[in-house]
């Protein structure tokens, strides 16, 4: 009795050249996506709210490869303008941390720059208001000092016996 065993051909167990190239491209993309999101996390620290979250594609080899990713960061202003300036700088640095920032990364960096500029404007306005209040107070003290001797006060006579 003869017996036969089936062995799959090498063509069916190995990927063809086109599939191998596709897998290699997916591996490179996966590596870049992970490095990109890790750069955000490394710089972001306490700004990171969630992530990384990845979108995957299944390659011809049946494995999943990350093809996109995101990290959610806190982009809200801080309690005060003075605290907002360094936070905005941190947000911008986090957004631009990857060596290849995406359009979304540039958009977040622009928002952070606007937040920083607004906070600096608020700080400058508060300083102007404080100086104006100090000048007004100084002028008031100066006027009071002028009248201290009584010589500059308008004359008034009071006759209690009239």
Q: What do these predicted ranges mean?
A:
Residues 1-162:
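Type III/flagellar secretion export determinants
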């Amino acid at each position: 009795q003869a017996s036969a065993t089936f062995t799959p051909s090498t063509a069916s167990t190995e990927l063809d050249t086109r599939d191998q190239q596709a897998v290699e491209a997916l591996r490179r993309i996966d590596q870049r996506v992970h490095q990109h999101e890790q750069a955000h996390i490394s710089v972001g620290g306490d700004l990171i709210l969630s992530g990384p979250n990845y979108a995957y594609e299944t390659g011809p080899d049946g494995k999943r490869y990350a093809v996109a990713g995101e990290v959610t960061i806190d982009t809200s202003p801080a309690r005060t303008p003075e605290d907002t300036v360094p936070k905005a700088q941190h947000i911008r640095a986090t957004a631009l941390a990857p060596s290849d920032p995406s359009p979304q990364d540039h958009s977040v960096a622009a928002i952070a720059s606007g937040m920083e500029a607004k906070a600096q404007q608020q700080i400058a306005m508060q300083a102007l208001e404080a100086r104006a209040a100090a000048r007004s107070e100084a002028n008031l003290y100066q006027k009071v000092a002028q009248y201290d001797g009584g010589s500059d006060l308008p004359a008034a006579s009071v006759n209690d016996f009239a």
